[in-house]
């Protein structure tokens, strides 16, 4: 869908909403720029890093009676995938406890809304298991500390309905790509919150779905399970999560089944088809309220990927950084360390599979500056 068609669609929906009784609508967004200094890129180091455009996004939130609309569209550089819908759904809010969402909505899995604090997210994001949105129907229940989300997703965000077409690389979150496609996915997430001073949450998530191969026209399968725990105490926040997943594609006989293609931001790569991940995040917020600086949030986010295939080397990621809050301006300063992580090293296609090229850790200093409105 082109940007022009998307804006026309959003305009028409808003016009419909505004024609009703006492509608509510809000238009927001953000403009972000990014600086990075990567120690594995010789040219980047000689230049003292690079600074440029990151993303411009538009958010639309509207309601009429019990009908809700929530959407976010992002504009990246063409080399990073160009324009893409992050999420967009129409829903019905029965009351404060029950909501239905239809469309491209956020997949309920693990600690939410994020399993991390930094610009890079956790390693789960790069496997399609954090901050992902797919096309389907989701039911949300909230009452007396309980959270229940049940969803069915027909497929990942689909941009071309033609038969036999591979999944587009222009997407925000990672989905299965290449000659395989995500289909008929079910998700269930249950979490319980308790405590007043020490605010705890413990939860479990499950996902099961199909993998349709365009060549063999056979249906494979995939699953993922996770347990998570979060704690908020005063200005401290802790997140911890264990995740296991397995993809079983029905590829052609001459193609490997111990790895699978994933894609986002216009650049696909391979990941291990069977792995466990471990994540742990800790942050502390300092209230400042002086001048333009409201707060400083310090954090360290660690995650690792243990690959079940013999001979596949594990992947690691550790992000130490801070977020500076200045009214509508947020600045993330991150020192990212990665080992066998495609975004943090020279090995793009095999870092999440065999990972035989990288021998040590790589580092990236990243500063992201955004104005949110």
Pin down the residues of each PLM region.
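Outer membrane beta-barrel
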Residues: 22-38, 47-159, 191-195, 333
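Transmembrane beta-barrel strands of outer-membrane/channel proteins
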Residues: 29-35, 71-75, 102-104, 150-154, ...
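Solvent-exposed loop segments that connect transmembrane elements
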Residues: 44, 159-177, 214, 248-269, ...
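Outer-envelope beta-barrel architecture signal
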Residues: 21-29, 65-67, 96-98, 144-148, ...
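Residues that define the transmembrane beta-barrel architecture of outer-membrane proteins
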Residues: 23, 47-56, 82-86, 131-135, ...
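Outer-membrane beta-barrel "beta-signal"
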Residues: 280-282, 329, 359-373
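Detector for outer-membrane/organellar transmembrane beta-barrel domains
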Residues: 192-308, 316, 371
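Sequence/structural signature of outer-membrane beta-barrel proteins
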Residues: 34-42, 74-79, 109-111, 116, ...
């Amino acid at each position: 869908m082109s940007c022009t068609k998307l804006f026309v669609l959003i305009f028409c929906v808003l016009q419909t909403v505004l024609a009703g009784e006492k509608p509510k609508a809000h238009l927001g967004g953000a403009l972000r720029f990014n600086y990075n200094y990567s120690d594995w890129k010789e040219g980047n180091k000689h230049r003292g890093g690079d600074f440029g455009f990151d993303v411009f996004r538009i958010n639309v939130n509207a309601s009429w009676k019990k009908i809700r609309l929530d959407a976010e569209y992002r504009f990246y550089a063409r080399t990073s995938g160009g324009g893409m819908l992050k999420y967009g759904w129409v829903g019905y809010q029965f009351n404060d406890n029950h909501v239905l969402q239809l469309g491209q909505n956020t997949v309920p899995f693990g600690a939410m809304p994020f399993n991390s604090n930094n610009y890079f997210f956790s390693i789960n994001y790069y496997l399609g298991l954090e901050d992902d949105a797919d096309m389907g129907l989701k039911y949300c229940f909230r009452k007396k500390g309980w959270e229940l989300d049940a969803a069915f997703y027909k497929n990942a965000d689909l941009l071309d309905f033609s038969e036999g077409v591979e999944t587009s690389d222009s997407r925000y979150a990672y989905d299965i790509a290449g000659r395989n496609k995500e289909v008929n996915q079910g998700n269930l997430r249950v979490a319980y919150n308790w405590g007043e001073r020490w605010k705890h949450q413990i939860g479990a998530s499950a996902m099961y779905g199909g993998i349709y191969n365009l060549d063999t026209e056979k249906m494979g399968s995939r699953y993922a399970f996770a347990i998570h725990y979060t704690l908020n105490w005063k200005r401290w926040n802790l997140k911890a999560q264990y995740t296991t997943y397995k993809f079983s594609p029905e590829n052609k006989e001459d193609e490997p089944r111990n790895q699978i293609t994933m894609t986002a931001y216009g650049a696909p790569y391979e990941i291990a088809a069977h792995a466990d991940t471990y994540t742990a995040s800790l942050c502390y917020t300092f209230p400042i309220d002086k001048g333009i600086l409201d707060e400083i949030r310090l954090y360290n986010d660690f995650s690792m990927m243990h690959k079940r295939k013999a001979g596949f080397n594990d992947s690691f990621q550790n992000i130490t950084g801070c977020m500076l809050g200045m009214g509508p301006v947020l600045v993330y300063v991150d020192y990212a360390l990665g080992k066998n992580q495609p975004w943090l090293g020279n090995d793009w296609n095999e870092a999440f599979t065999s990972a035989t090229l990288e021998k040590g850790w790589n580092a990236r200093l990243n500063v992201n500056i955004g104005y949110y409105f």
